[in-house]
């Protein structure tokens, strides 16, 4: 999920991965 959202958001990966 982190990679999917990150690719779409660009910077979302960093925030998502940190939370996950």
UniProtKB/Swiss-Prot annotation:
It is found in: Secreted, Extracellular space. Induction: By low temperature. Its main location: secreted. Optimum pH is 9.3. N-glycosylated and O-glycosylated. Coiled coil: none annotated. Keywords: Antifreeze protein, Glycoprotein, Secreted, Stress response. GO terms for cellular component: extracellular region. The keyword ATP-binding does not apply. Antifreeze proteins bind to the surface of ice crystals and inhibit the growth of these crystals, this inhibition causes thermal hysteresis. Causes the shape of ice crystals to change from hexagonal to a bipyramidal shape with rugged facets. Inhibits recrystallization of ice crystals. This is Antifreeze protein.
């Amino acid at each position: 999920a982190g990679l999917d959202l990150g690719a779409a958001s660009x910077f979302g990966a960093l925030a998502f991965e940190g939370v996950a």
